[in-house]
Each structure stands twice: as C-alpha cells, then as structure tokens.
Amino acid sequence: MTRTQILSALIAAAPLAGCAMPAPASAPPSSATAQEAFWQALSNHCGKAYAGGLASTDARDADWAGKRMVAHWAACDEARVAIAFHVADPEAAAGWNRSRTWIVTRSGEGAATRFTLKHDHRHADGEADAVTFYGGTSTDAGTARAQDFPVDGESVALFTREGLDASLTNVWRVAVDPAAQADARFVYQLTRRNDPTRLFRVEFDASTTITAPPAAWGW
C-alpha cells in the first residue's frame, strides 16, 4: 500500500474510531429526596379510598375499638392532599361520623421541603368545630415513607384556650406506602412527648381500594 493509500485509509477510519470511543462517564442520576419520595407516595393514592381500623390498644381509645374506618383521598393538588377520615358511628347521620379531614401541605423545595399536617374538624352542618385546624410542621427530612409533625405554636395556643393541656406535646405521624406496592399500608398515628404510654394508631389496607364514601362534612 502506497503512502497516499495509507493516509486515505486513516482519514476514512477517523470518524468510525470517533464513534467507537466510549462516551464519557455521566454523573449518576440524582435520587429523589426523602421528602420528594414521601410526597409522591402520598399523592399517588389521590381519589382512592381504603378500609381500616384501630391498630393500637391504649385503653383511652376503647370507644374506637372495632369500628369500621375509611380513609379517602378527597382532594389533591401540587401542594396539598386532603384525606377524609370516616368512622362508623351508629349515633351519627347515616351511621358514619364524617367530621374529620387530614390536610397535608408542602412548602419549600428539595432538601428544604417541609410538610404541615392540619386537622379540619366540622359538624354535620359543615360548620367548623371549636377545636379545628390544629397540627404541626415537620422539622427534618423525615423518610420516604413517614413524616412526623410536632405540635405547632398555633395549636398549643388553641389547646390551652380549650383546656386540652394533655395535647400540648402532641406529635403526629403519617406513614404511607406507594399505591403500587402489593402490601401497601397507610397509617395515622398520635404520640405525646411527655407521655411515652400514649399511642393512637389507625391503619388502612392501601393495597385494596373500596368505593369512595360521601364527602366529609363541610367539603
């Protein structure tokens, strides 16, 4: 092969060699923060309803034992998820107490994202209860499946005014599995920092949907 032929072959092969070179290593995909994963897990239940019941055994909650309960993702948007909590009650209209709605909102971005849980309590006519819209805001990243909500100052003032001193150290927890998970659960829990014996916990089977109930009172 002449020098001219060799040079021509090298020039022709150059583009192919360039294509064959390994691509530069790309940065590994950034994983979702715990907050992003939690919000996604909570949000992907929107519109669904699940059956559940009392899972704790605190004697103070004896009147809740054995009652049918339903959690219904009644309203959702990019910054808010409202979950109606229905409790079977033979003394309530149509046999159900529909007075409670848990409202979780998000604020901030990325690792600075925080969540706030508020309790919307209504009477059967839709009017707000004297003790309503209490709750707290998460103080750390939490986990992809659970967030804790220590009682906030606004709620402390409300509880103090209403003589609910036992609630001044409330810590609520919301735990949720993604809707696609085979054994998915949804949990609402209450504990108190000054009372290690206090535990109120309701659990729902979030792997099996049920027919959505009527709207919560006032919604």
Pin down the residues of each PLM region.
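Mid-chain, structured segments of secreted extracytoplasmic proteins
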Residues: 74-117
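Edge beta-strand at a domain terminus
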Residues: 130-135, 185-219
